[in-house]
């Protein structure tokens, strides 16, 4: 039996708003992306709502939705997803927090400690475990993205804003308060500064002109989610290709294997060629691939339009181009979309619907001939909830017509 191949390619934060510096166009409109444009001309286009009304426009919510799980039912928080990605098993009452290493004085300077190296971050996490008296434990992740786990369901109600949403704002104004659990988290965040500022890793970074990690920021907490495995839903094997712990963790709970790609960093310097090569090769073993590229989101957070354009072009050439070549030997369906916009001008996520292409066997072309935030509005898909995308992707009998 011939098995259809299914691919979802996510350019994280790829969508944007028109920019004066681009003569009123978006990075997607300006980028040279022949593969995306050709695919748009061959398939059906529209807008997907990846973030349900009233929920935060996080990559956790948005990618959960794209994978086919309605966040209103399945989402518990970002922390447990990242715990799964690094093999940390949570008990029923364990609450997992995302633990950013950040640079701050009285204000938050950045949310990533100058994109600290993973080995440096690991040393700092060891020091936090050794020096801070806490009922929980810190776990090293990748670069500034780390984890803190503590027992007690009351910690789920602590409100802390994501640090990437409050860069430039007062630290004190955004520390949690109002409950015993919130006070404990606030104390940990403040006490971390005393541990980190004099650490040899930070002293060395400062001597090299790099930003030190001056404190931790705990946020995005939640309990372990309960999700129906992908194989039980659709009866096929799937895998993720991503350098971001959050997406790996989503895959773990969904029963998707993660394919490690050497040189994939989750940043602007990621090896696009390697991601494309490994994705193409994985089609020989897996019938579903979720390929995620973080770079456009990082460019959006940095407010760098040229870097976002470059990231889009690299995804198009080295990832999508390679995938389309490999898929030509198979019956297939492929979707290309961002998880959410990360507009250059505001440097954070917004919940706006995202432009989507769905192409392949059983999908009739509409009149859209290029791919961006505006052309897709004329497409045959219209606007719909992103968690329904998988229903169409995985139903071999489904046929999308104009």
From Swiss-Prot:
Catalyzes the interconversion of 2-phosphoglycerate and 3-phosphoglycerate. It comes from Methanothermobacter thermautotrophicus (strain ATCC 29096 / DSM 1053 / JCM 10044 / NBRC 100330 / Delta H). CDD domains: iPGM_like. The lineage of its organism: Archaea, Methanobacteriati, Methanobacteriota, Methanomada group, Methanobacteria. It comes from the Archaea. Belongs to the BPG-independent phosphoglycerate mutase family. A-PGAM subfamily. This is 2,3-bisphosphoglycerate-independent phosphoglycerate mutase 2. HAMAP family: ApgM_A. It catalyses: (2R)-2-phosphoglycerate = (2R)-3-phosphoglycerate. The keyword Transmembrane helix does not apply. InterPro entries: Alkaline_phosphatase_core_sf (IPR017850), ApgAM_prokaryotes (IPR023665), Metalloenzyme (IPR006124), Pglycerate_mutase_ApgM (IPR004456). NCBIfam families: apgM, hyp_Hser_kinase, PRK04200.1. Signal peptide: none annotated. It holds the Pfam family Metalloenzyme. Its EC number is 5.4.2.12. Keywords: Glycolysis, Isomerase. One of its GO terms (biological process) is glycolytic process. GO terms for molecular function: metal ion binding; phosphoglycerate mutase activity.
